Amino acid sequence: MKLTCMLVVLLLVLPFGDLIANTGGLCGMPPGVCYPNGCACGQDTPCCHPSGCNRYNYCGPLLE
């Protein structure tokens, strides 16, 4: 039971590891917001620049 609880906690925390470690934030959708800097994004990956959004205020495969 204790092991199961630890595994559940790890599964809940691991997706946010990049969000915590990367100052650029994690891109998620829908509607597509890059946390914590708030730019729009087109894919569910860590894609925003550490300094914020790119010149199009967007992060994604086409506009990086």
Swiss-Prot record:
One of its GO terms (cellular component) is extracellular region. Expressed by the venom duct. It is found in: Secreted. Residues 1-21 form the signal peptide. GO terms for molecular function: toxin activity. Keywords: Disulfide bond, Neurotoxin, Secreted, Signal, Toxin. It comes from the Eukaryota. Contains 4 disulfide bonds. Probable neurotoxin. Belongs to the conotoxin O1 superfamily. The cysteine framework is XII (C-C-C-C-CC-C-C). This is Conotoxin Cal12.4. It comes from Californiconus californicus. The lineage of its organism: Eukaryota, Metazoa, Spiralia, Lophotrochozoa, Mollusca.
